[in-house]
């Protein structure tokens, strides 16, 4: 926990108000009133920090940092590569990105630069080093914020210029060595797409190649690598005169960049959380999505993360942008902390008067100062967080289950032309995660490079691609006593999207032989029974055969494949593996995972059934985490968050004895929660 306390604050843009000293003075006074203890500076300040090439003006920034320090407000200092000044693009137009259609962008928007460009890298490296030298040892500067929402330029973040084409070819040479290996990996003899010269290779383009999924996958990997390398360059630049940790702000399940690769350049994970609260009357789907994203960020490094941005109330970039209803700001903020965040930060502190984000929510609106509902909501969070500092310092969530979410698998599933063109990998994974969330079973969100040894249960929905070593890792996990769940259309292809021949890589573990995949329309949906209830088999129905010894729990009831298995369980070593051959609905996933949790010995922190809309998480001291398989440490002392996402009161029964960590109230057997309320509990000693 940075500074030993939870951070509360957000993006502060004083450069927009340098001609209004009374505003800057008022800002600090109101920050103290709102309980703000940390702000992020300099995110989009390049044009003010370097108004002319090589002419730096840091004095205004130093004055702001010093004034914040006098008020005991800490600073996260950004490098300003998120948006370029016009003098740069005018003098060096070659730094601007080239689109997939070959057209070079005009100046504008954000991140409109080539990550490969040596000139761009040199310019920002020099500026970053100067910032590091001037501010890297300031007492109240605690963290580097590298750029901003990398690749977030209203496109896919890729540049297709000749520099990038050349770098891509060199990357491919390093990966494959020879064109023969590349042609084999991309199945180049199909349609005579055999490359005989490295110069023939070009990035995917709407007026060029769009049908070779191996090329598409490698291009996406290359873009991630170039962007990660750029981020690493900035990390090294600020480290020249400073030993502060560094982060950059991620954007949930952002398809274009593999965050599991990018995170390797960072010391701390942070991200920007903008759930679509009040999209519908039922807030649970949005709560599940936000919880999934928080869990994914925490899981990347198995440590607390930072909520770098969130909206104090409204945003400005969806078709309709509802304000947060009373109670939702506190609940949404506490949800982040409950899942492992050591901060609640906002975009932004004060609304700007003009341009694109002038109507994006902020702590301070254009008028009325602190006399607004939003300010009061923020101030309430500012009062609550310090009460949790002592309890949460050094704590981390410690799930015993994991769900696979892998970027390369995502790219492959949605790029291929297969049984369906409308496969939605994140939606599929999220439907499985919801079954965990509703039971209060925490899960890490991991990729195929993760270590599985600390988990009792691993679920891998729609695991189409098997990276090298993944099958062996899963096999060892199950052999050693783990429970593995996977689904239809899994284990189909390798990392370059070449289909496996012969057998499924985990056929012996799963106990199932794949044969066909039916993608029925609604009129031809199938059905099956599980635990005495009927469920739909829809959209993807795999026609499989159970191997000898495999337990068939459900079969199709219709069509020519009636009697073929839908749900199977196979004992392998000390563990077991489940295969779900068809897509079904949430009702089935609830029933299925309820049984799996029981077999895995997984319970929520309250060890009770949760009402609809309620979930729980737990943070415990990292050095007190229960040892794997150690029953004596199962009732460790932790901090439990009980969250109600229903806009109505609920009662949680059968909870045992707990103490409210903030009020000291003792709860025995039941806990009553108001609408959109979060309770923070400590276990009562027996």
Regions found by a protein language model. Give the residues of each.
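Conserved, mostly hydrophobic/aromatic
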Residues: 10, 31, 39, 68, ...
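Short, acidic/polar
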Residues: 17-33, 126-130, 251-262, 325-333
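Short, well-ordered coil/turn segments that N-cap beta-strands
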Residues: 4-8, 35-37, 69-75, 137-142, ...
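Polysaccharide-binding and catalytic clefts of secreted carbohydrate-active enzymes
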Residues: 101-268, 272-279, 283-292
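Carbohydrate-binding surfaces of carbohydrate-active enzymes
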Residues: 195-202, 240, 263-267, 274-686
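Aromatic-lined substrate-binding rim segments of carbohydrate-active enzymes
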Residues: 25-33, 40-103, 233-241, 464
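Boundary/entry segment of secreted carbohydrate-active catalytic domains
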Residues: 1-20
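Aromatic- and glycine-enriched glycan-recognition loops and surfaces
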Residues: 15-32, 52-67, 122, 126, ...
